[in-house]
């Protein structure tokens, strides 16, 4: 706001980071509060009332434009209030005092129970300015989509020994690209030949991985060598969300949504009897959850969109999914007879 204006020459818009219309809203288990700022383009000499309403169409457009799948949080699950905490209705709106150019709207979300709001669903609150006295609206900046980042408490699998978790997918032998994802906490990263995941009985080139605290992650495709490692150090005792994306004879390694390295290698393809094996006998009091296999090469934005929350098993292209949590009714894991037990 850098001037003064009357209704005929003033305009109203919703301020958001970088004016992109998106607000990331982090919720604790018992809920959370964030603020929106409707603004006037110029200072007004008289009070202005700005109406803000629920706008599912704005979320539908966001999902379509971004390939996202956020569901609208119902109006009954949140409240709007002014900066002092007085609850607002859509008809009342928020008041901008004379001589000012903005107001704060408090958005308050209570506890979202897992029965009504499953952890594998992503929610957003779509809000738009619907009117402001006789002022015009800036169409490209009238909406704010609040993307909810929820803190989810979940059980995980604790693993020691065994021969890894083996997944035999159906139909992958016809696919030229794929994505493997896993989430793990390693108690240490100095063990010899500690693998994250590998492909057994593949019909194309070799895919075998190792993980180390100093050299990062190795993608072995027929040979060893320093250049087969990402050379980015990793920490034990922290969640590592690891993603391998293979397409066009390239394998890209991501950790926690960030590219570590792109490896040039041969085509790595599945056979009809191929299995993905996650881990090996090197497990020592490590934690695992969220093992996923996709029959497509996920993009970086898709990887980050799906990174932390449980998935809907019906998600397109998700071929195999092991959430490894009691909440998702995963039972205790036992290794085959004759091998060391894998415990949960």
Regions found by a protein language model. Give the residues of each.
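Bacterial Sec-dependent N-terminal signal peptides
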Residues: 1-25, 139-152, 261
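Extracellular/lumenal carbohydrate-interaction signature centered on repeated Trp-anchored short motifs
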Residues: 29, 167-180, 231-238, 269, ...
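Short glycine/proline/serine/threonine-rich loop/turn segments at secondary-structure transition edges
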Residues: 113-124
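Extracellular glycan-recognition modules
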Residues: 152-216, 298-303
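Short hydrophobic/aromatic patches on beta-strands that form ligand-binding or substrate-lining surfaces
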Residues: 178-188, 242-244, 291-293, 322
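Flexible glycan-contacting loops in extracellular carbohydrate-active proteins
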Residues: 260-288, 312-319
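Extended recognition patches within non-cytosolic domains
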Residues: 290-344
């Amino acid at each position: 706001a850098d001037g003064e204006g009357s209704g005929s020459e003033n305009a109203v818009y919703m301020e958001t980071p970088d004016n992109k219309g998106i607000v990331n809203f982090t919720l604790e288990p018992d809920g959370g509060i964030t603020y929106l700022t409707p603004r006037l383009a110029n200072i007004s000499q008289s009070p202005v009332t700005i109406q803000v309403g629920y706008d599912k169409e704005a979320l539908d457009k966001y999902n379509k434009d971004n390939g996202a799948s956020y569901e609208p949080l119902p109006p009954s699950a949140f409240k709007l209030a002014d900066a002092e905490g007085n609850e607002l209705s859509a008809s009342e709106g928020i008041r901008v005092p004379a001589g000012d150019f903005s107001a704060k709207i408090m958005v308050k979300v209570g506890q979202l129970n897992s029965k009504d709001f499953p952890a594998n669903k992503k929610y957003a609150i779509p809000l738009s300015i619907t009117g402001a006295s006789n002022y015009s609206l800036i169409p490209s900046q009238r909406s704010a989509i609040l993307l909810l980042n929820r803190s989810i408490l979940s059980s995980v699998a604790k693993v020691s020994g065994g021969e890894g978790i083996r997944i035999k997918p159906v139909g992958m032998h016809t696919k030229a690209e794929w994505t493997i994802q896993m989430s793990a906490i390693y108690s240490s990263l100095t063990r010899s030949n500690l693998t994250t995941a590998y492909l057994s009985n593949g019909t194309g080139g070799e895919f075998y991985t190792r993980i180390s605290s100093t050299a990062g992650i190795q993608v072995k495709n027929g040979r060893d060598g320093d250049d087969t490692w990402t050379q980015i150090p990793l920490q034990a005792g922290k969640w590592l969300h690891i993603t391998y994306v293979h397409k066009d004879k390239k394998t890209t390694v991501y950790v926690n949504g960030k590219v570590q390295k792109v490896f040039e290698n041969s085509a790595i393809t599945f056979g009809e009897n191929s299995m993905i094996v996650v881990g090996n006998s090197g497990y020592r009091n490590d934690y695992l959850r969220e093992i996923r296999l996709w029959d497509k090469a996920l993009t970086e934005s898709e990887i980050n969109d799906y990174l932390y929350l449980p998935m809907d098993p019906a998600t397109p292209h998700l071929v195999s999914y092991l959430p490894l949590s009691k909440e998702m009714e995963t039972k205790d894991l036992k290794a085959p007879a004759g091998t060391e037990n894998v415990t949960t």
